[in-house]
Amino acid sequence: MRKKNYKGRCEKQSLEKFTTICKTYDPIQSAYANILVKNKDVAEVRCNVPLDGDECGEYMTDFVCKKTDGDLMVRECISTKLLEKPLSMKLLDMSRTYWLRHSVSDWGIVVDAAEE
């Protein structure tokens, strides 16, 4: 989850199942985009989907996937080192609440591998 007008480094890829060019902003997003392409349960993927509404209008969800059974699946990518930060938790909770209001129950986070 990041701001709509994020100015960081962006990698653009043309991937199967994605409705537009896939723009990823970190290695976690990039790796998960490739996982979604290989997932047989996923029919279509949209990335960096803006959240509508006043309370969350400046942010985007990382991945909104339409599954083969017609249900939606939402995934937010975040580094494990950011998970304990209050703002990160607030944004993730805002995303989860937003998608629950839009009848999406399959919401989850994607984290990088924990370093030992």
Residue ranges and their predicted role:
Residues 1-116:
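Electrostatic, structured charged patches in enzyme active sites and in nucleic-acid/phosphate-binding
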